[in-house]
């Protein structure tokens, strides 16, 4: 009997970098209603790969299926179809969980425990010896920027949101995991808290950890991630490196002088005419042909600067395309 890991489309490596997360046509359908005869499709055939040592961002609007995908990968819920591997083993493998860290969105932390006691509890679940705990816990507190005094003396009900998030991050790292899942790690944090969380994630990346997280704060994702995927309405809209996705729609801000105004309007968006024959606009076409056209009409280029769209602009564009496609399908089905 052939294992699904042997199939040609489900290999564990690409070039020289092994994958640590891989899914193929992963699906999740929930049953609802009094008789459990109604179906809600939460995830529709998701196929993606996360490689060792990279920081991977999962993006999508509310209700897109991001948390469902995380729970499937972690083995918290079972898939309705498809297949997946986590660190080379099928999803749900108990032994793999020893090598994984997880920070959920808005985690419940035992408020009458101190941060230190909570980390001892988390370490005990992994059967980490007390001697190792005494060394590991102070190291983690230092990493997440929480003082030993606060961790030992204050009950967590007296912690700020940022302090709770840092304790949550420390417990996700208590077992020194190879792969770390973070569900909205910057949710509810102020700018300073986001900065500190970003620095923690970057330090983990520098240490060779693989990080899989979802977030609505796209500016932070753009600073941190190597690759991203966008989910919308349970479907994987796109995935790839930021350079691949954002670089595919590069634009150029062009400033020049002289030339035929009507021809320039055909090439440039947002064209503005200025005194003494100067003009500026945005170019989204092949700039080689544009430069040749400017020379032929006697104009000159003063400057041309590459202006890559932001992740936020790309994200909104992709979601709007997905919504438009969905409405078109619905409209056609009603004809």
UniProtKB/Swiss-Prot annotation:
Sections of the chain in a coiled coil: none
Annotated CDD domains: ABC_DR_subfamily_A
Transport in keyword set: yes
Keyword Transport recorded: yes
Sorted UniProt keywords: ATP-binding, Nucleotide-binding, Transport
Domain ABC transporter: 21-258
InterPro entries: AAA+_ATPase (IPR003593), ABC_transporter-like_ATP-bd (IPR003439), ABC_transporter-like_CS (IPR017871), ABC_Transporter_VariousFunc (IPR051782), P-loop_NTPase (IPR027417)
Molecular function terms from GO: ATP binding; ATP hydrolysis activity
Gene3D superfamilies recorded: P-loop containing nucleotide triphosphate hydrolases
Amino acids binding ATP: 60-67
Similarity remark: Belongs to the ABC transporter superfamily.
Name of protein: Uncharacterized ABC transporter ATP-binding protein all4389
């Amino acid at each position: 009997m052939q294992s699904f890991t042997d199939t040609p489309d489900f290999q564990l490596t690409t070039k020289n970098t092994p994958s640590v997360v891989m899914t193929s046509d992963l699906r999740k359908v929930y049953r609802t209603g009094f008789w459990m005869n109604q179906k809600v499709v939460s995830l529709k055939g998701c196929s993606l790969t996360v490689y060792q040592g990279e920081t991977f961002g999962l993006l999508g609007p509310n209700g897109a299926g991001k948390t469902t995908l995380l729970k499937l990968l972690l083995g918290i819920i079972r898939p309705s179809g498809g297949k997946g591997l986590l660190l080379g083993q099928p999803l749900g493998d108990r032994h793999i969980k020893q090598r994984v860290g997880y920070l959920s969105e808005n985690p419940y932390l035992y408020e009458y425990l101190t941060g230190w006691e909570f980390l001892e509890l988390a370490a005990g679940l992994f059967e980490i010896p007390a001697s190792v705990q005494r060394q590991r816990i102070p190291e983690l507190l230092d990493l997440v920027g929480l003082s030993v005094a606060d961790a030992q003396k204050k009950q967590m009900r007296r912690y700020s949101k940022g302090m709770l998030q840092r304790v949550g991050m420390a417990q996700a790292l208590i077992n020194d995991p190879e792969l770390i899942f973070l569900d909205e790690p910057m949710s509810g944090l102020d700018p300073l808290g986001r900065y500190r969380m970003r620095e923690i994630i970057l330090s983990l990346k520098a240490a060779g950890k693989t990080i899989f997280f979802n977030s609505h704060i796209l500016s932070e994702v753009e600073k941190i991630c190597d690759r991203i995927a966008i989910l919308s309405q349970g479907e994987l809209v796109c995935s790839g490196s930021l350079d691949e996705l954002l670089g595919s729609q590069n634009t150029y801000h062009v400033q020049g002088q002289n030339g035929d105004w009507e021809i320039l309007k055909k090439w440039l968006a947002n064209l503005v005419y200025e005194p003494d024959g100067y003009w500026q606009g945005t170019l989204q076409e092949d700039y080689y042909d544009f430069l040749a056209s400017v020379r032929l009409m006697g104009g000159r280029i003063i400057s041309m600067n590459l202006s890559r769209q932001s992740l936020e602009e790309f994200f909104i564009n992709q979601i709007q395309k997905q919504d438009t496609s969905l409405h078109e399908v619905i409209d056609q089905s009603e004809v």
